[in-house]
Every structure is written in structure tokens, then in C-alpha cells.
Amino acid sequence: MKKFFIIGTNTEVGKTYISTKLIEVCEHQNIKSLCLKPVASGQSQFSELCEDVESILNAYKHKFTAAEINLISFNQAVAPHIIAAKTKVDISIENLKQFIEDKYNQDLDILFIEGAGGLLTPYSDHTTQLDLIKALQIPVLLVSAIKVGCINHTLLTINELNRHNIKLAGWIANCNDSNIKYIDEQINTIEELSGYKCSAKISRNADYLDFIDLSKILI
């Protein structure tokens, strides 16, 4: 079983969009996948579920339950450690790790774990998402929304991954804003300064077919 932890350079960079398209291409190719969203925030306007959890379940056509893919949910779209403190919820690294590792014995080809926001998103006053990734020791798939500031955010994230000896399986350029100029130049700069080639350049309104080459790299 291949395992990948999907993080963004920031929040709202398209992690869940990328996750759902990877799910769709796996389903299309009869690749047995499971995408977890261990920590989620921001309730959907259409149900009691968090929006990201609902999107993942929809991509699977509800063959999984919310409890199978999500451990901790908050209705408010607020940084996890803040809303956890307000609601007296303990976001335990050990509990999250156990929730994820419990899936390792399932008959899967690939396991995706979609994180909450960026690499250093706090889970508490003394832990961050990085601590969970280090505990799991699995490669990271990084999503960067190409726009002003993305070069700095992407390089900082890659540098931090390297500093902690966490493998970067690849990075995806999410080019979802057609108004952004010099997209290729920004991608080229990230490639040159980081030493990592872009694994996939995803344009606005892409469908799962645009992810087939990426799925081949991952699997």
C-alpha cells in the first residue's frame, strides 16, 4: 500500500479539490484507494458534515461513511487549535496516528491523508501537523495555488520538509485562477530554487483525466 499525506502551502489552496480528483482517477482505473480527512473544520451548508468531508464522500459516491474517513470535526472554519481549545477537544497526535494506522491492514492500493491547511498548522499550543507527519513517517504531496506569494510559501514548506527529513513525493501547481499572470514563470522559479520538478500543473475546471499521469507517478 502506498501512503501520501496531502498538505497545502496554506489554507484554501485546493487540497480537497486535488484529493477528490485523485479519488476519481483511482476509481476510474479500479485502483483501491481511501482518502482520510482526520481533522476537518467548516460545516457544509448542505449537511451536518464538514464541507471537505462531504466532498470526499461524494467523490466515493458514499461507499464510505464519515466516521471511516474523519476523526475530529469542527463546525466553524477556524484554525483547529483555536476551536479545539474553545470546545475543549483534545487533538491528540497519538489518537490521530492510531486512527490512520488502523487503515493499514485494509485491502488498499493507496491511502491518502488530507491534512488541515499547511505543514505547521497547530493542533494545540505545543503540537502541529508536522508532528503528526513525523510520527507517521510517510511522504508528503504538496499542493500550491499559483498566485502572488506562492513562491515564498512553497519554498518555505519544502525547506521545512527537508529540514525534518520528510520525503516530498511531489508538488502540484493548482492553476485555478485564470487572472493570474506569469504562471509558468512562477512554477519554473519554484522548480529551480527548490530542486523539485512540478509533478502536475492543474488548470481551472480540470477533470480526472488530467490526473492520470500524476496517479501513475504516485502508484
UniProtKB/Swiss-Prot annotation:
Its cofactor is Mg(2+). It catalyses: (7R,8S)-7,8-diammoniononanoate + CO2 + ATP = (4R,5S)-dethiobiotin + ADP + phosphate + 3 H(+). Pathway: Cofactor biosynthesis; biotin biosynthesis; biotin from 7,8-diaminononanoate: step 1/2. GO terms for cellular component: cytosol. The active site is at 37. The keyword Thylakoid does not apply. Mg(2+) binds at residues 16, 52, 114. ATP binds at residues 12-17, 52, 114-117, 174-175. It is found in: Cytoplasm. One of its GO terms (biological process) is biotin biosynthetic process. Keywords: ATP-binding, Biotin biosynthesis, Cytoplasm, Ligase, Magnesium, Metal-binding, Nucleotide-binding. GO terms for molecular function: ATP binding; dethiobiotin synthase activity; magnesium ion binding. InterPro entries: DTB_synth_BioD, P-loop_NTPase. Pfam families: AAA_26. It comes from the Bacteria. It is an enzyme of class 6 (ligase). Its EC number is 6.3.3.3. Homodimer. Catalyzes a mechanistically unusual reaction, the ATP-dependent insertion of CO2 between the N7 and N8 nitrogen atoms of 7,8-diaminopelargonic acid (DAPA, also called 7,8-diammoniononanoate) to form a ureido ring. This is ATP-dependent dethiobiotin synthetase BioD.
